[in-house]
């Protein structure tokens, strides 16, 4: 049976409260946008846009005064609920949750990605020396993820399980997963005295965990997907995009501006991340992550189709994506994504 935690109950309550803090209108005048972000370096482009007011600046260049409202949630399931309820217009989610919301809203709200944000590898880490591969995980083990099965990490774990045990057993490890925000999971892992002995993490938390010599990496998104891949995207609905073309264009331009800033000045980007996430990490530590050879921040997606094809093959989504353009808005006809 999956254990429960006071922090989980508190988080669930806060998620529900957050969904009602903002007005639930689905349509409004140009110049207003409600954005839901998540914690972590994966959504650095939105954090840079917020910190530097890049959306407002892009709007001003087009003669539009934009009021941006921000909220932060944890996990793709909570964020998808915020989008579907109208509590958010635009949000950060992983490729797994993107496939889910794209599949389920086709022909209705038609949620798709505006742009990629980052290709930052995510690691499955453990503090148990016994566990060296997926096949070593058993009944006594518990894996912390932000949303059981449906998060980006949950979907990657399903893909790894299918690779190890066959497609019919893709959900074999789901029953060992526990809902827990990354920060709490990191604390549990570092304590060494929690029921949690694995964490499918993200940046910067996985790097903090690996600073402890008792913690090691079991696998990663890079290994599961066979190379670097976009893990975080920015999404909205076709309806919101059509109803707010100028605001949408400002958001899209701001993401490109943010990507250029990150590419040009990693030190400034690290400082922005620390400021926006309220992180206690040192600027040098964060900058080292941003300079990792396997990490990149670009608005064109990389190696995303493979996960979508897998989710269709095992029956998680009904519609098979044939191209990355199926679940991304076609704003740049010349973009060479994958």
Question: Each predicted region: which residue ranges?
Answer:
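Bacterial N-terminal signal peptides that target proteins for export
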Residues: 2-14
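Cleavable N-terminal signal peptides
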Residues: 15-17, 27
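Sec/Tat signal peptide C-region and signal peptidase I cleavage site
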Residues: 22-29
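Short, glycine-/small- and polar/acidic-enriched structural segments
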Residues: 31-170, 175-179, 193, 197-203, ...
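Small-molecule pocket liners
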Residues: 44, 118-124, 215-216, 230-234, ...
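Pocket-lining segment of extracytoplasmic ligand-binding domains
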Residues: 166, 171-174, 178, 183-274
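Secondary-structure end/capping motifs
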Residues: 241-318
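Conserved C-terminal helix/tail region of periplasmic/extracytoplasmic solute-binding proteins
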Residues: 311-338
């Amino acid at each position: 049976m999956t254990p429960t935690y006071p922090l989980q109950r508190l988080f669930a309550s806060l998620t529900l409260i957050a969904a009602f803090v903002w007005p639930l209108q689905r349509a409004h005048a140009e110049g207003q946008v409600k954005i839901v972000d998540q914690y972590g370096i994966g959504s650095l482009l939105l954090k840079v846009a917020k910190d530097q007011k890049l959306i407002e600046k892009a709007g001003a260049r087009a003669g539009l005064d934009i009021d941006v409202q921000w909220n932060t949630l944890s996990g793709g399931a909570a964020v998808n609920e915020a989008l579907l309820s109208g509590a958010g217009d635009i949000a950060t989610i992983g490729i797994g949750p993107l496939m889910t919301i794209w599949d389920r809203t086709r022909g209705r709200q038609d949620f798709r990605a505006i742009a990629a944000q980052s290709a930052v590898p995510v690691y499955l880490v453990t503090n148990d020396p016994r566990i060296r591969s997926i096949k070593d995980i058993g009944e006594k083990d518990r894996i912390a993820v932000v949303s059981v099965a449906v998060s980006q990490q949950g979907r990657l774990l399903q893909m790894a399980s299918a690779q190890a045990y066959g497609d019919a057993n893709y959900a074999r490890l789901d029953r060992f997963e526990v809902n827990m925000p990354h920060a709490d999971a990191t604390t549990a892992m570092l304590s060494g005295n929690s029921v949690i002995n694995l964490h499918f993490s993200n940046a910067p938390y996985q790097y903090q965990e690996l600073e402890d010599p008792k913690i090691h990496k079991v696998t990663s998104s890079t290994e599961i997907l066979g190379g670097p891949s976009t893990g975080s995207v920015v999404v909205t609905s076709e309806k919101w995009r059509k109803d707010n073309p100028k605001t949408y264009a400002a958001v899209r331009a701001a993401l490109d501006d943010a990507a250029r800033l990150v590419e040009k000045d990693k030190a400034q980007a690290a400082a922005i991340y620390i400021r926006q996430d309220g992180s206690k990490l040192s600027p040098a530590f964060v900058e080292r992550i941003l300079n990792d050879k396997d990490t990149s921040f670009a608005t064109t997606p990389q190696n995303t189709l493979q996960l979508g094809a897998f989710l269709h093959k095992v029956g998680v989504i009904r519609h098979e994506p044939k191209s990355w353009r199926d679940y991304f808005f076609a704003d740049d006809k010349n973009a060479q994504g994958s």
